[in-house]
Design a protein with these regions (language model features):
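Hydrophobic helix-cap positions at the C-terminus of alpha-helices
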Residues: 25-27, 81, 85, 121
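Active-site neighborhoods of divalent-metal-dependent phosphate/nucleic-acid chemistry enzymes
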Residues: 65-112
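Conserved glycosyltransferase catalytic-site signature
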Residues: 5, 37, 96-98
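A generic structural signal for short hydrophobic patches within well-formed alpha-helices
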Residues: 8-9, 40-43, 118
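A general structural signal for well-ordered alpha-helical segments in protein cores
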Residues: 20, 40, 53, 75-79, ...
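Active-site-proximal, substrate-binding regions of enzyme catalytic domains
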Residues: 51-71
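Short, well-structured N-terminal submotif of metal-dependent ribonuclease cores
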Residues: 1-35, 45-58
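Acidic, PIN/NYN-like endoribonuclease modules and their adjacent C-terminal/linker elements
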Residues: 101, 105-133
Length: 133
């Protein structure tokens, strides 16, 4: 499973959301979770202070990384997905969402999220599997 920063942040804040609950279950059951670098960056940039940054970094470095087979192709795929969304009349709030979606597509893993944009992206990219919560 690929977990978007929106689900991680809800989990870390202790927010009671479907995605945060599903992530807590996945962690407790040691389900395989791959961490794309872009998700790591999005989580770390929200650290409250230097100490929190270091604690988050240490915790997240224990997760297996998602490593794209070809980073340039991943970037191209994300740009193309973003453009396809725009052509369909929907502009994602962040290009990072398309990059994260393409990580899930390449990994052939479902995406856990707390971000409505992924629902719209999945309507355009039918092979994007979202974790049901």
């Amino acid at each position: 499973m690929i977990v978007d920063s929106s689900a991680w942040i809800a989990h870390l804040r202790g927010t009671d959301t479907p995605a945060a609950r599903r992530l807590a279950i996945a962690l407790a059951q040691r389900e395989p979770i791959q961490l794309p670098d872009i998700v790591l960056m999005e989580v770390l940039r929200g650290a409250r202070d230097a100490g929190n940054f270091l604690r988050l970094e240490q915790a997240f470095l224990t997760l297996p990384r998602f490593v794209p087979s070809d980073p340039k192709q991943l970037a191209r795929n994300a740009a193309h997905l973003y453009a396809r969304c725009r052509w369909a009349g929907f502009t994602p709030g962040s290009g990072n969402d398309c990059l994260i979606a393409c990580c899930a597509l390449e990994a052939r893993e479902p995406l856990l999220h707390e971000d409505r944009d992924f629902v719209r992206i999945a309507q355009i990219e039918k092979s994007l599997a979202l974790v049901g919560v």
